[in-house]
Amino acid sequence: MERTFLMIKPDAVQRNLIGEIISRIERKGLKLVGGKFMTVPQSLAEEHYAEHTDKPFYKHLISFITSAPVFAMVVEGEDAVHVARHIIGKTNPSEATPGTIRGDLGLTVGRNIIHGSDSVESANKEINLWFKADELSEYSESRESWLYE
């Protein structure tokens, strides 16, 4: 099964949306295999967003992501990266489809609720950056036979 990294950002944590977001992800068939509630250290934020270093929003992004706790998680399922990206919606909430997390709950592009890996390669990199191997669980759910052929 494929895994992907998701991070519920400070704006969603402050708005008490963690449960709502996880519920939507699980209802779509993705299984939570790791999670942690944490304040992001500056060094981790900088490494995670290293590809944006030269962009004008970089300093604001680092400041925002380290300003309050996040809920970092790893989910697993068939085509997990694609499924999660579909549930999340477009980066800008005003362009996101209603029914997606950002379409329903996001406020602005700078307060867009959640981060999700954009490829299998990014997912693997981000999972290894945020989680140690022993922080992730391997288990079966009874519903799996109902979800996957």
UniProtKB/Swiss-Prot annotation:
Residues the record lists as binding ATP: K9, F57, R85, T91, R102, N112
SUPFAM superfamilies from the UniProt entry: Nucleoside diphosphate kinase, NDK
Listed cofactors: Mg(2+)
Pfam entry (one): NDK
One GO CC annotation: cytoplasm
Disulphide linkage map: none
Stretches of the chain forming a coiled coil according to its record: none
Compartments (UniProt record): Cytoplasm
EC number: 2.7.4.6
Reactions the enzyme catalyzes: a 2'-deoxyribonucleoside 5'-diphosphate + ATP = a 2'-deoxyribonucleoside 5'-triphosphate + ADP; a ribonucleoside 5'-diphosphate + ATP = a ribonucleoside 5'-triphosphate + ADP
Keywords: ATP-binding, Cytoplasm, Kinase, Magnesium, Metal-binding, Nucleotide metabolism, Nucleotide-binding, Phosphoprotein, Transferase
Lipid metabolism among keywords: no
EC primary class: transferase
Record-level GO BP terms: CTP biosynthetic process; GTP biosynthetic process; UTP biosynthetic process
Molecular function as annotated in GO: ATP binding; metal ion binding; nucleoside diphosphate kinase activity
Positions of the catalytic residues: H115
Recorded family membership: Belongs to the NDK family.
Biological role: Major role in the synthesis of nucleoside triphosphates other than ATP. The ATP gamma phosphate is transferred to the NDP beta phosphate via a ping-pong mechanism, using a phosphorylated active-site intermediate.
Subunit structure: Homotetramer.
UniProt protein name: Nucleoside diphosphate kinase
Gene name tied to this protein: ndk
